[in-house]
């Protein structure tokens, strides 16, 4: 039996019921982002006469320029809350000697550009969803296994498992980053104009997804027709009937008013929407031990704060949706179990592409 199958069997007490189942990077955009960062910091950097010849900076020195943190997300999101809390904590813990400026809305580049620039140390800090990272770090696909968890607290317990975090930190280190933690925006859910209460109801639904093979495989397994589409086109796509449905966390659904074009929100809870905070490993190694400790401590505080904010905001977003007249559908345990059975080939595919140690650690509480 696959690790995923065994996990689900143990989790749901069904040992006898589950069968064995086993473009080239855009250089000009990156250059533009780097030039923007240099322009933002050059004046202040020039005023600093305390540079170390060994490339490190003493914690006692006053930082005369702010390190940039890039994000592709809008301001009114948990991603921004996570980033700003981290920057505030770094400032507080260093008594104002260490400064970070947050640049949301893809000001410094999209997800791919941010990852490239972070690796090189041009944009030392990045906060982003884990989905775009699969191209750079294939083991992050472990987060793409669908329909495993009943609630977000359970997800957090598995993500925070020390053994799992140690393995994932090595994955990021090998790619040129240091992983500082994972916050989240709860689960991803589906919106549609069709009342969906059974597995058969998903059939034929043309649903917008991210361009991620595992995400698309999930919807195909349910009988839907996944359609990758640029996010900026989703609202008008729903409005014009180009697509029937879409999937996102509650935060995105409300901030972009997608519920205005849909009659139902279906709590598929198929994937947790995890948000990573990463730093360039090269940049981090150039800091003093004290500065590194400040950054790690600030990241832990920011993670916990972002999770608390996420829980509060989701409750508020649900109320906004319900007040608009859009109905929220909670699927039965039976339907969730049927979905898990349909996902067995996806679990098998992920097992083939992700380190078995990482899979085992993620499935262990």
Question: Where does each model-flagged region fall?
Answer:
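N-terminal secretory/targeting leader peptides
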Residues: 48-153, 163, 172-365
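Short, flexible, basic/aromatic active-site loop/helix in glycosyltransferases
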Residues: 169
